[in-house]
């Protein structure tokens, strides 16, 4: 059943990619559930995912970063809940940078321990998708079909450093850590989009992505269900590690 959900996400990604190629949308006079200003294409991408996922008999509900409430399907006894960010990094569209979609497939409950599969889509020069279950598999859309490029694996030591958040608000200990990475020869690679930045680290073999709690956002800004848990799951399947600085991400409560 999870394969059916993933196939549906692939088809939705194709539709969203086509929208992005002809996008002329602007900002709406509204914000999403996280308080971010919405673009018209954010809302349209959300509609595409919602409509296609709620038609599946195996999906009980969907939980979108763009909406306040969980949306339930008519399949009340179905096992899976899909949480997703339909268009992560959409503020980069006007710069013509890569953006993405993020998803997590949960069994029964919205908690990290119930995550059965996760992944993301990259809308860039090529359309790509990474899906993690037992391993994290890398796909690219070529000649009108999805090609499996193989499993992604992180090296023992990377060279990319992607630190997010406003530097002047970083805590001293985080600033010291980032400076120590640069002193070790790590290279700065940060676009402001979670999907392209984390994807680059995987493709290039390793590194560190961080978006810490700051003085102006003491709880951090990343959302667990739609962003943090799915990417933590992917990275662990690639041989990496995800932490909040105290404990493993996939042991955290929602």
What residues fall within each predicted segment?
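IMPase-like, lithium-sensitive Mg2+-dependent phosphomonoesterase catalytic core
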Residues: 1-22, 31-32, 37, 43-254
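Alpha-helical coupling/stalk and coiled-coil linker elements that connect catalytic or binding modules
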Residues: 27-28
């Amino acid at each position: 059943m999870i394969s059916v959900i993933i196939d549906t996400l692939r088809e939705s990604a194709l539709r969203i990619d086509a929208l992005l190629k002809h996008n002329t949308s602007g900002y709406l006079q509204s914000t999403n559930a996280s308080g971010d200003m919405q673009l018209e294409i954010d809302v349209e991408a959300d509609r595409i995912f919602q409509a296609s996922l709620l038609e599946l008999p195996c999906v009980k509900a969907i939980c979108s970063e763009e909406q306040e409430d969980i949306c339930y399907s008519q399949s009340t006894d179905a096992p899976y809940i899909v949480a997703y960010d339909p268009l992560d990094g959409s503020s980069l569209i006007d710069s013509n940078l890569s953006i993405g979609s993020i998803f997590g497939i949960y069994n029964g409950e919205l908690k990290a321990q119930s995550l059965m599969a996760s992944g993301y889509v990259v809308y860039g020069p090529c359309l790509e998708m990474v899906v993690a279950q037992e391993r994290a598999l890398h796909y690219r859309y070529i000649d009108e079909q999805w090609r499996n490029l193989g499993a992604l694996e992180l090296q023992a030591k990377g060279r990319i450093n992607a630190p997010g958040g406003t530097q002047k608000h970083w805590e001293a200990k985080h600033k010291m850590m980032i400076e120590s990475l640069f002193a070790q020869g790590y290279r700065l690679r940060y676009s402001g989009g979670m999907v392209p930045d984390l994807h680059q680290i995987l493709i290039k073999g390793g590194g560190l992505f961080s978006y810490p709690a700051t003085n102006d956002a003491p709880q951090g800004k990343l959302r667990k269900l739609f962003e943090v848990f799915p990417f933590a799951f992917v990275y662990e399947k690639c041989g990496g590690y995800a932490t909040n600085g105290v404990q493993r991400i996939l042991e955290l409560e929602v």
